[in-house]
Amino acid sequence: MLFFFVKLEVRLKRFLSLISALVLSTQLYASHIVGGDMYYDCLGGNTYQITLKIYRDCLSDGADFDPILPVTVFNGLNVQIDQFTIPYPGSVTLDVLFDNPCITLPSDICVEEAIYQKTVTLPDSPTGYTLSYQRCCRGPAVTNLNDPDDEGLTLQIDIPPTSFAVCNSSARFTNYPPLVLCSGQEIEFDHSAIDPDGDLLVYELCSPFGGGSSVLPAPDPASPPPYDPVVWGPGFSATDPFGDGDLTIDPVTGMVTALPEAPGLYAVGVC
């Protein structure tokens, strides 16, 4: 039996990631979003390269990639102090790897990736910074969210004040997660991250952030933090995203063990 595993969001240190559902829609605000990553690299001094990896459903007739992607800058008191934009860089189609003989891979699974990057200089700040990007929507077919057609995403990274003195960079994940699993079959996959500075990373299941709505699909500027988590549907939670199925993550290694039972599209968060 076919099962779609969809990792909706990951918050790890100052790193945020989201992989959302592959769903078709006829409305521009709807489920073209498949997900995204956001992280930064310190280039020296107060200069940073900001990277956002945005994923969308190739076959969706919803909105395309944003031609201009807005990023809002807040200080540590959650007050907006700046904003910058990144033009659309073009996209590539990702390979969907699936070699389980339980089912033939459906032909309607296709993911595009666009990597938005910009180099910015930020002045020293005693409170640090939060950079945010928000977009809606995930799509009506996500199984474990209360109102997925009105749930968007927030990509957020925090640059602490200590980063300016030591030129710190944020963590980022090394593997694109699987999009397709088979129900009733256990699978393990490596969902670990790397930190360029060698900082210790600890993993746990958590609730993804929402962001935007069907009324305001692309907030510009983004709303200030703190951000609200998604609203789970009945019988689901951050630590029980599969309902009757099982999902665990090793807090040290980042290895995920999944045993889905009911077919569907599932939101799963890792912090």
Stretches with model-predicted labels:
Residues 29-271:
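Long, compositionally biased, intrinsically disordered segments
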